[in-house]
UniProtKB/Swiss-Prot annotation:
Biological process, per Gene Ontology: regulation of pH
InterPro entries in alphabetical order: Na/H_antiporter_dom_sf, NhaA, Thioredoxin-like_fold, Thioredoxin-like_sf, Thioredoxin_domain
Catalysed transformations (reactions): Na(+)(in) + 2 H(+)(out) = Na(+)(out) + 2 H(+)(in)
Statement: the UniProt record of this protein carries the keyword Transmembrane helix: yes
UniProt subcellular location: Cell membrane
Protein encoded by which gene: nhaA2
Molecular function via GO: sodium:proton antiporter activity
Annotated Gene Ontology cellular component terms: plasma membrane
Positions of the UniProt region annotated as Na(+)/H(+) antiporter NhaA: 1-434
Keyword tags: Antiport, Cell membrane, Ion transport, Membrane, Sodium, Sodium transport, Transmembrane, Transmembrane helix, Transport
Native species: Nocardioides sp. (strain ATCC BAA-499 / JS614)
Functional summary from the UniProt entry: Na(+)/H(+) antiporter that extrudes sodium in exchange for external protons.
Main location: membrane
Membrane topology listed for this record: Multi-pass membrane protein
Name this polypeptide is given: Na(+)/H(+) antiporter NhaA 2
């Protein structure tokens, strides 16, 4: 138990990002890391625009650049190439992320998605209403400025002023910004686009149908999607719609899916073949097998997201944040109702809209907050959502002419500073007054191992403990049996291995029945023998199959089938599922080393290192 306690203390200091699934962890790390570059680009733009070289700043972004092919050419100034060209790539990546969330992420579960969706809608409606109520006259047209949230700045600010452990809050806020981005791009298309060209819109429709067909047909190579998106972007620019529409719609049409068992096993076979015969053709086959196993959506995200976060968004800030505040411009902005309409709508509107919509949704029973996230965290995240920046600057450039655009930009910059300070104050108050500190999944095994109730392999007093939450129909759990066997051979009597049931009934229809069968076999002292058989025959888990395995093991088949249907057997499985929820195990296999949830790879070498570390 002392080793478990020390392991828990060390685990509490680990990087929280390691607790996330790989795609979400990659997304968060890239966005949070780019926040520093974004801040630097903003500062550089302001310094440049207010220096003796301010003329060169204006000249740079007004310089013309063209792409010509035969008689066709597309000409824009550099500012528009950034706003209409590179930012379309940014919104394409956002569209990819939205599609992934709806297909395999947080938005697949209506109960889990309900509160973030309500929060996002509140965070859109309340700021817009506040802005319209405050803004003078024709400036009310710019209400779209206050609806967006800058994901990079939001996550960067959360890392600085938010809870130390905030995994679940980050995912919640990321889901909110996904809805935010969908609405923001829709608003740009509906309210801030130029006169429209019906012929070009027809060409857009052709490319959209083409992209939908590519996804429908399961085309796994990225090149056809890239070419279709390029054609869609050109048609959108010619149509008069803002190019961000092309990016978002294109991303939404690229299918996302989890790797199938067949694809993963096929890739593994090809890599084994490459190890045995490392020539060029076999290596190419192995590489293609891996590409086929991972959805084109995630491959495009992995390739493009660093570019948009570390290059496109900072370049956008450099091109758009440079407001010349000299000659009374700053004073005029501070005296303008437009400026303060932006500030109040972003700082107070986002806080109230996201926070109150979440409270209403929870109390109405429409959904629940993610485990570990409480309302104080939601209000703090709502405050930080007032950092509108990227989308706000983009819409300000579309909605206003020069003087009003400068005032709106000043308001956006002031709001970013105030929203960060308000977020810190809300998080601090929630921690001090309500005890709402961490906002992440539980990390410690709950309840601890009890040999009287758990399925235990090894000495009860062994110095090392490895607990696995598994599903008998999960192919990844089946492969993990080889890992646990290797670990038991390596550590011998020093290792106690525990198996707990976590049947994922939504995706594995026979998993719960198989778990009950294993418990029924345990009543006759043959749990581990049936455990091994079930993983060897994952495709054959009907009642007749289970009875056959029981007979092969020499069990009393009648007693086995009777126990299979007993409430006590089902309760035993449900207790393990409840302990998985209490321990923060959301998928299979999930391992606990020394009572602490293991994050990252679960190959034999990685788990062996973690077990050795838990000794001291």
């Amino acid at each position: 138990m002392r080793a478990e306690g020390r392991g828990q203390t060390r685990a509490r200091r680990r990087s929280l990002a390691a607790q996330l699934s790989v795609p979400v962890r990659r997304y968060l790390n890239t966005e949070a890391g780019s926040a520093g570059l974004l801040l630097g680009a903003t500062a550089l733009a302001l310094l440049w625009a207010n220096s003796r070289w301010s003329g060169s700043y204006e000249s740079l972004w007004s310089a013309q650049a063209a792409v010509s092919v035969s008689r066709w050419d597309l000409s824009m100034d550099l500012g528009h190439w950034v706003n209409d060209g590179l930012m379309a790539l940014f919104f394409f990546v956002i569209g990819l992320e939205v599609r992934r969330e709806f297909s395999v992420g947080e938005l697949t579960d209506p109960r889990r998605a309900a509160i973030p969706v309500l929060a996002a809608l509140g965070g859109l409606a309340v700021p817009a209403l506040l802005y319209v109520a405050i803004a003078p006259g024709s400036a009310a047209h710019g209400w779209g400025v206050v609806i967006g949230t800058d994901t990079a700045f939001l996550l960067g600010a959360l890392a600085v002023v938010g809870p130390t452990f905030a995994t679940q809050l980050r995912i919640f806020l990321l889901t909110v910004t996904v809805i935010d981005d969908i609405v923001a791009v829709s608003v740009i298309g509906l309210f801030y686009s130029d006169s429209l060209d019906p012929a070009a819109i027809g060409v857009m429709a052709v490319f959209l149908v083409l992209m939908a067909a590519l996804s429908r047909l399961g085309v796994w190579r990225a090149a056809p999607y890239v070419l279709a998106v390029l054609g869609l972007w050109i048609a959108t620019v010619q149509s008069g719609l803002h190019a961000s529409i092309a990016g978002m719609l294109g991303g939404l049409l690229v299918a996302a899916h989890s790797p199938t068992r067949e694809a993963v096993e096929g890739a593994a076979r090809r890599f084994r073949a490459f190890r045995q015969s490392p020539d060029v053709q076999v290596g190419r086959s192995a590489r293609l097998g891996l590409a086929q196993a991972v959805s084109v959506n995630e491959r495009l995200q992995a390739a493009l997201h660093p570019w948009t976060s570390y290059l496109v968004v900072p370049l956008f800030a450099l091109a758009n944040a440079g407001v010349d505040l000299r000659d009374g411009v700053l004073g005029d902005a501070l005296a303008s109702r437009l400026t303060w309409a932006v500030v109040v709508a972003l700082v107070l509107g986002k806080l109230a809209g996201i926070g109150l919509a979440s409270v209403a949704g929870v109390r109405a029973g429409l959904g629940r907050l993610p485990r570990g996230v409480r309302l104080g965290h939601v209000f703090g995240g709502g405050a930080l959502s007032g950092i509108g920046f990227t989308v706000a600057l983009l819409i300000a450039g579309l909605a206003f002419e020069s003087d009003q655009r400068d005032r709106a930009t000043v308001g956006i910059l002031i709001a970013a500073v105030l929203a960060t300070g308000l977020g810190w104050a809300v998080f601090h108050a929630a921690a001090v007054l309500r005890g709402q500190t961490d906002a992440d999944l539980p990390r410690f095994l709950d309840p601890p191992v009890d040999a009287r109730h758990d399925h235990v392999r090894g000495r009860e007093d062994a110095p090392l403990t490895l607990v696995e939450y598994g599903d008998f129909e999960c192919p990844f759990c089946a492969r993990a049996t080889g890992v646990t066997t290797e670990l038991r051979e390596r550590f011998g009597d020093d290792l106690r291995y525990v198996f707990r049931h976590l049947p994922l009934v939504d995706v594995h229809p026979h998993a719960e029945l198989a778990a009950r069968a294993a418990v029924a076999a345990d009543h006759q002292g043959r749990f581990w023998e049936l455990h091994d058989l079930l993983f060897e025959h994952q495709g054959e888990l009907e009642v007749e199959d289970l009875a056959g395995y029981a007979a092969d093991l020499g069990l009393d088949v009648e007693a086995f089938l009777r126990d299979l249907e007993e409430d006590d057997t089902a309760d035993r499985v449900r207790r393990d599922v409840a302990s998985a929820e209490a321990s923060g195990a959301r998928g299979t296999p999930t391992f606990f080393v020394g009572g602490v949830r293991h994050t990252g790879p679960h190959d034999a070498e990685t788990l062996a290192r973690a077990l050795e570390e838990s000794r001291t």
